Every structure is written in structure tokens, then in C-alpha cells.
């Protein structure tokens, strides 16, 4: 055991502690278990080792015996008063000294036998003294004995160490009055601790009196002042919260907030931006609309068809079909915002145009205007199937906006169950609802059902590819995009999606070729020649300013990422709006 933490100078207990710490290295490494917060390597350590020759022989004889430490048991720590008296007075003294008798009746052995009775008395007196000290709260450390009476060998060196150190210091243990020394030490420690406790209590009483005096004098005023400040702050926070509630209700009633926060698009905020009329070769052609339709049907460049429809609209701003075709073409040509504006204008002119509603719902979902998409789908269903259900429920309280999706889904599922045949448009709308909720597997099922009815719908093949890509099924998505391009080679959006899926599987060269092909489809005949004759003050970044949206932004940024993935910094430096695409034809096929 180690009692150095409780020593008080040069007293008998400190001397006894030094005796007990002898032979630390040898004993700590011979499996003597201990507890009480002492490190294993420093339990028994002494700077002096005095052992007689006879004693060394006895010690070697003892150390040669096997130790069955597997049977040792560690017991919970107990107070010093009870554990020391019982452990030392009881277990410690049940020592089988047959091994020492077998080594010969040496002087060392005779002295050990003579002092056994003395040690017994010492242990008993230590137990009684320790109990007294424990009752006075003098010591709070704990001692854990090993109580395996069948294996007492580890206790023998402990007794021998004490005896050897007593001889080295010239102590005669048989004549030492241990009880007197412990009584003296107990009185000394108790007096000191009682003095400190009394001093602490006195200081606490003094502090309490000072605190009471301060409260009765000036500090009470400061306390009340601080309390009033805290109370006023709480009242102010409450008033602010009430005002925030009113502001929040006003904000919910505000149209702009409804559009932004609830996923609604500000329809009137974006008008369609026409290309420069002076560059439109169809501007004065009376058959511009028919030309645009022919270009669409024959797979011509979508940019060419868009110019034809723009010319038709300039000639007749209320040309509903021209607005519809223009919106569809621009969306397919990767010009989503302009396409949405054209479709919204179409609905202003013809509120019941089902094709415009359907395509607008798709664009709203693509751009994140989910609430506008739900309302548009509801409007489409109410127009196509009037009286089927009460659409006014969706126009109810705004705090139920998160439930609109589930309501819309249930209604379209009910609509599917009531119609005997498969309606591709209903499957499309239902698939859009699943798509908006990231349920891509169910979306795929809806789109595949629609394709069974109309397998040559390139738009549906592209939508199926997007759903497959979002389900991490890039290989299947590529097949769907290829099918869409087989049906319509000028489908820029499908080609762009194909490039992205190719990137996802590491086919960077193929992705670059698809993107370069899509960029080449944005060029219309004579566009760059006309732009090159414009003033030098117009930068290349302004070449698409007339549309309000640079159509090549997505394509160019994606192409840059492809070149970065390929490690082609030399090609990366060439990518810019209005670049000459022929510079890439030596390495890429498009």
C-alpha cells in the first residue's frame, strides 16, 4: 500500500510508509495487485536495498515458488479503518512460513518468528487507530486487499521488506510502542484538520454576513436595477416576437414571397427576349410560321426554327400557336427561361391550352418552381377532365402547401384508375409528381407506360433518360437519350443530357463530342458573320444579349468540366462564347 499522499513531514507514519515502499521494482513486477489510484510501476520503490546474505537466500527461495495470480480477486475499495485492521490483522498474518523453515533455521528466520506476535499487535493497533481517524474524516484514501487465503505468497515479501528496513534503520520493532505513536499522529492530524475546518466555516459565515450586509446596503440597489433591465429585455423580446408574427402573416399574403418561398414563378417578371430583328432572315417572310413548323418536323436546327417563329410573332403578336411552338423549341434548344416566357404568353392568350400547361409544368419542375408546377398540373386536369374533382381545394390555406403534392398525387392516381385506357398525358403528369418528390423508380414506371402507347415520342424518351440518370442508372439513361436522338437528331437537350451521362461513366471524349455537336446546333447561318461586322465595342459575351439568356452557358460550362477531367488545359483555354468550333475538329468528331 502507498500512503505518501497522507504523510505530514517526518512523523512515524511517514517512516512506516517508507518501510512499506521498499523493493518497489521487484515486487511491482511480480504480480502484486494494487488499487487506490497509484501507478503500477511506482507502487513500491526505494532508493536503498539492505538485505543480509541469509535473507537474500530466503528471498530467492521464496521467489522460486509459483504464483497463481489467476485466482487473485480484486475487491471493492474499503475505508482505511476497516480494511487495514481486517486485512493486516487477519489475512496478512495468516502466513504459511513452511518455506522459510525448510531453508534452515537462520538468524533472519528466528528474528521473523520472534516478531510475529509483535506484528499482530501492531496490526490490531493500526486497525483501531485507523478507525478513529476514519471517523474524524482525517484520511479519505482507500485500500484494496487481496483476500485469497490459498495463495499467500505475495504477502510474504511485504512482511520481509518491513523487517529488513527496520534493521537497516536500527529500529527495534519488538519494543516500539506503535499505539502511542499512532495516537500522537492522530491527535496532530486531527488538530490541524479541525483547525482548517473551523477556519473554513468561519470564513463562510463571514462571507454570508458580508453578502447580507451588501444586500441591505448599496448592492441591493444594483441587484434590483439589473433585474429590472432583464425584465425589460424580456418584455421587449416578447413584443418583437408578436410583431414578427404579424410580419410573417403579411409575408404569407404577399405574392412575391409566395412565388419565391413556396416555389412559385413570377410570371410577369420575365418577358420573352427576341433575337436581334435585323439578324432574323425570316422577319419579312409572310410564311414564317409554316417555315418554322417545317424546320421542326424535318430535324433542322432548332435555332433556325426559333427565328422563324419569332418572325411570325412579330407579324402577329397574338399568334397563339406561334407562341406555343416557340416555347417548345426554345426548351428543346436548352433555352429554358425564354421557352417558359413564350409558353406563359401563350396561356395568357389561350388559358385552356393543354399543351402549353403540360410543357410549362415540366419546365417549372426543372427550374424548381414546384408549387407552380402543381397548380399547373391541377389546372391541366381540371381543363381536360372538367368536373372530375373539386380543384378549389388546392386553392385553400397557404399553410397546407406542403400537402398539395400528396393531394395531387392521390387525385391523379384516382384518375388513372377511373380511365379504362392508358392516357400518356396522365402518365406524364403523374410521373412529374413522382419526379418532383424524388421517387424516380415510380417516375420511370409512368414514363415507360406512356412509351408503350407512343413509342416514337422523343420527348418522353428524353424524360425517361433523365429519370434513369437520377436513379444512378447512367448506362440505361444513355440508351434512352440515343433513342430520342434517333427520333430527332436536332434535340439539343437530349444531346446535352447524353453528354452529362457520358461524363458520369468516365467517357469524357464522347461527352465532349456531344457538347460540341450541341454547340454547333446553336449556330444559325450567317450569325457569326453578322456579329463579326458589329462594332468592336461589343464583346463576345454580349453576342447573346438580345435573348436575355446566353444559350451556350450550360453547354460551355459543361464542356470546360469535361476538358478539366481530361487534363486538357490547352483546350480549356479555348472555350469561350462565340469561339470557332472548327479548332476542335482535329481531335473530336461532331
Swiss-Prot record:
Coarse class of the protein's main subcellular location: cytoplasm
Q: Please give the name of this protein.
A: Peroxisomal targeting signal receptor
From the record, which residues define motif WxxxF/Y motif 1?
Answer: 108-112
Instruction: Using the UniProt annotation, give all residue ranges assigned to the region (Disordered).
Output: 18-45
Q: Which UniProt keywords apply?
A: Cytoplasm, Isopeptide bond, Peroxisome, Protein transport, Repeat, Thioester bond, TPR repeat, Translocation, Transport, Ubl conjugation
Family that this chain belongs to: Belongs to the peroxisomal targeting signal receptor family.
Compartments (UniProt record): Cytoplasm, Cytosol; Peroxisome matrix
Glycyl cysteine thioester (Cys-Gly) (interchain with G-Cter in ubiquitin) cross-link position in this chain?
6
Cross-link named Glycyl lysine isopeptide (Lys-Gly) (interchain with G-Cter in ubiquitin), where?
18
Q: Which organism is it from?
A: Candida glabrata (strain ATCC 2001 / BCRC 20586 / JCM 3761 / NBRC 0622 / NRRL Y-65 / CBS 138) (Yeast)
Region of interest (Amphipathic helix 2 (AH2)), residue spans: 56-74
Which is a GO BP term held by this UniProt record? protein import into peroxisome matrix, docking
Q: Name one GO cellular component term.
A: peroxisome
Tell me the function of this protein. Receptor that mediates peroxisomal import of proteins containing a C-terminal PTS1-type tripeptide peroxisomal targeting signal (SKL-type). Binds to cargo proteins containing a PTS1 peroxisomal targeting signal in the cytosol, and translocates them into the peroxisome matrix by passing through the PEX13-PEX14 docking complex along with cargo proteins. PEX5 receptor is then retrotranslocated into the cytosol, leading to release of bound cargo in the peroxisome matrix, and reset for a subsequent peroxisome import cycle.
Amino acid at each position: 500500500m502507498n500512503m505518501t499522499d497522507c504523510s505530514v513531514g517526518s512523523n512515524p507514519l511517514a517512516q512506516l510508509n517508507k518501510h512499506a515502499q521498499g523493493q518497489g521494482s521487484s515486487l511491482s513486477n511480480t504480480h502484486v495487485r494494487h488499487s487506490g489510484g497509484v501507478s503500477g510501476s511506482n507502487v513500491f520503490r526505494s532508493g536503498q536495498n539492505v538485505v543480509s546474505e541469509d535473507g537474500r537466500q530466503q528471498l530467492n527461495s521464496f521467489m522460486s515458488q509459483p504464483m497463481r495470480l489467476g485466482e487473485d480477486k480484486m475487491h471493492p475499495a474499503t475505508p482505511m479503518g476497516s480494511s487495514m485492521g481486517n486485512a493486516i490483522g487477519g489475512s496478512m498474518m495468516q502466513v504459511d512460513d513452511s518455506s522459510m523453515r525448510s531453508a534452515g533455521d537462520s538468524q533472519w528466520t528466528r528474528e521473523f518468528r520472534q516478531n510475529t506476535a509483535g506484528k499482530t499487535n501492531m496490526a490490531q493497533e493500526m486497525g483501531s487507530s485507523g478507525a478513529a481517524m476514519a471517523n474524524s474524516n482525517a484520511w479519505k484514501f482507500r485500500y484494496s486487499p487481496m483476500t485469497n487465503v490459498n495463495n499467500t505468497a505475495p504477502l510474504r515479501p511485504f512482511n520481509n521488506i518491513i523487517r529488513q528496513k527496520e534493521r537497516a534503520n536500527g529500529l527495534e520493532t519488538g519494543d516500539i510502542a506503535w499505539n502511542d505513536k499512532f495516537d500522537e499522529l492522530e491527535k496532530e492530524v486531527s488538530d490541524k484538520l479541525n483547525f482548517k475546518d473551523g477556519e473554513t466555516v468561519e470564513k463562510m459565515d463571514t462571507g454570508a454576513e458580508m453578502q447580507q450586509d451588501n444586500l441591505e446596503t448599496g448592492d441591493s440597489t444594483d441587484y434590483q436595477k439589473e433585474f429590472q433591465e432583464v425584465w425589460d429585455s424580456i418584455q421587449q423580446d416578447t413584443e418583437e416576437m408578436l410583431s414578427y408574427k404579424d410580419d410573417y402573416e403579411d409575408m404569407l399574403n404577399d405574392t412575391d414571397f409566395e412565388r419565391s418561398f413556396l416555389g412559385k414563378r413570377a410570371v410577369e417578371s420575365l418577358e420573352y427576349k427576341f433575337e436581334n430583328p435585323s439578324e432574323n432572315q425570316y422577319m419579312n417572310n409572310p410564311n414564317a410560321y409554316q417555315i418554322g413548323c417545317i424546320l421542326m418536323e424535318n430535324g433542322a436546327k432548332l435555332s433556325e426554327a426559333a427565328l422563324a417563329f419569332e418572325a411570325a410573332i412579330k407579324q402577329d403578336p397574338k399568334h397563339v400557336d406561334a407562341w406555343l411552338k416557340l416555347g417548345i423549341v426554345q426548351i428543346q434548344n436548352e433555352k429554358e427561361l425564354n421557352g417558359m416566357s413564350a409558353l406563359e404568353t401563350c396561356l395568357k392568350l389561350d388559358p385552356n391550352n393543354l399543351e402549353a400547361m403540360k410543357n410549362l409544368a415540366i419546365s417549372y419542375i426543372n427550374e424548381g418552381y414546384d408549387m407552380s408546377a402543381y397548380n399547373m398540373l391541377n389546372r391541366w386536369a381540371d381543363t381536360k377532365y372538367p368536373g372530375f374533382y373539386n380543384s378549389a381545394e388546392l386553392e385553400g390555406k397557404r399553410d397546407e402547401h406542403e400537402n398539395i403534392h400528396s393531394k395531387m398525387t392521390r387525385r391523379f392516381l384516382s384518375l388513372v384508375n377511373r380511365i379504362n385506357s392508358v392516357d400518356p398525358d396522365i402518365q406524364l403528369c403523374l410521373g412529374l409528381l413522382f419526379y418532383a418528390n424524388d421517387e424516380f423508380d415510380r417516375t420511370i414506371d409512368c414514363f415507360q407506360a406512356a412509351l408503350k402507347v407512343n413509342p416514337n415520342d422523343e420527348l418522353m424518351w428524353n424524360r425517361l433518360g433523365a429519370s434513369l440518370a437520377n436513379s444512378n442508372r447512367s448506362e440505361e439513361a444513355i440508351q434512352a437519350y440515343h433513342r430520342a436522338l434517333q427520333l430527332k437528331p436536332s434535340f439539343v437537350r437530349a444531346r446535352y443530357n447524353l453528354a452529362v451521362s457520358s461524363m458520369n461513366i468516365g467517357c469524357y471524349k464522347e461527352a465532349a463530342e456531344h457538347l460540341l455537336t450541341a454547340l454547333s446546333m446553336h449556330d444559325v447561318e450567317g450569325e457569326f458573320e453578322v456579329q463579326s461586322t458589329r462594332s468592336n465595342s461589343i464583346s463576345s459575351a454580349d453576342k447573346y444579349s438580345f435573348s436575355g439568356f446566353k444559350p451556350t452557358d450550360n453547354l460551355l460550362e459543361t464542356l470546360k468540366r469535361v476538358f478539366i477531367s481530361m487534363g486538357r488545359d490547352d483546350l480549356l483555354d479555348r472555350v469561350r462564347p462565340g469561339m470557332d468550333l472548327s479548332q476542335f475538329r482535329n481531335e473530336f468528331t461532331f
